[in-house]
Amino acid sequence: SSSEDKVTVNFINRDGETLTTKGKVGDSLLDVVVENNLDIDGFGACEGTLACSTCHLIFEQHIYEKLEAITDEENDMLDLAYGLTDRSRLGCQICLTKAMDNMTVRVPDAVSDARESIDMGMNSSKIE
């Protein structure tokens, strides 16, 4: 495929390290993480079936405003995510567009899997 069908995405991982990768327009951010084997711990546990909240990402404001409207299903799942912000979405629901080229998304410090009641985040009670 030609390079113009790809966009660059920067993921700021939990440890603050930036992972820069490319994804195909139309792929979800979960696809991008999986296909590029990005080392984001626990990301995408349910493989995009909207059964967990591990692909929770925090977007830049100007990107967030252009995202597709959120569905009730995604909203319900986001409610279960730790460190929820007003710019949070689930990566499995967000598909790449050319407008997202070179965007930066942040992986929240704590991850919760809605399928488990186990507290995986060390500081989940702290609100940023």
From Swiss-Prot:
Q: Which residues of this UniProt protein bind [2Fe-2S] cluster? A: 46, 52, 55, 92
Q: Which organism is it from?
A: Ovis aries
Q: What is its main location?
A: mitochondrion
Q: Where in the cell is it found?
A: Mitochondrion matrix
List each copy of the 2Fe-2S ferredoxin-type domain by range.
7-111
Q: Provide one Gene Ontology biological process annotation.
A: P450-containing electron transport chain
How and how many cofactors are bound, per the record note? Answer: Binds 1 [2Fe-2S] cluster.
Family according to the record: Belongs to the adrenodoxin/putidaredoxin family.
Does the record carry Lipid metabolism as a key word? yes
The protein's UniProt keywords, in alphabetical order, are: 2Fe-2S, Acetylation, Cholesterol metabolism, Electron transport, Iron, Iron-sulfur, Lipid metabolism, Metal-binding, Mitochondrion, Phosphoprotein, Steroid metabolism, Steroidogenesis, Sterol metabolism, Transport
Which residues are annotated as modified residue N6-acetyllysine in the UniProt record? 6
Q: Can the keyword Transcription regulation be found in this entry's annotation?
A: no
Q: Which domain of life is it from?
A: Eukaryota
What Pfam families does the annotation carry? Fer2
Q: Which cofactor does it need?
A: [2Fe-2S] cluster
Q: How does it assemble?
A: Interacts with CYP11A1.
Q: Which GO molecular function annotations are given, in alphabetical order?
A: 2 iron, 2 sulfur cluster binding; electron transfer activity; metal ion binding
Q: What is this protein called?
A: Adrenodoxin
Q: Which residues carry this modification: N6-succinyllysine?
A: 6, 98
Q: Give an example GO cellular component term for this record.
A: mitochondrial matrix
Q: Quote the function comment for this protein.
A: Essential for the synthesis of various steroid hormones. Participates in the reduction of mitochondrial cytochrome P450 for steroidogenesis. Transfers electrons from adrenodoxin reductase to CYP11A1, a cytochrome P450 that catalyzes cholesterol side-chain cleavage. Does not form a ternary complex with adrenodoxin reductase and CYP11A1 but shuttles between the two enzymes to transfer electrons.
> Positions modified as Phosphoserine?
3, 117
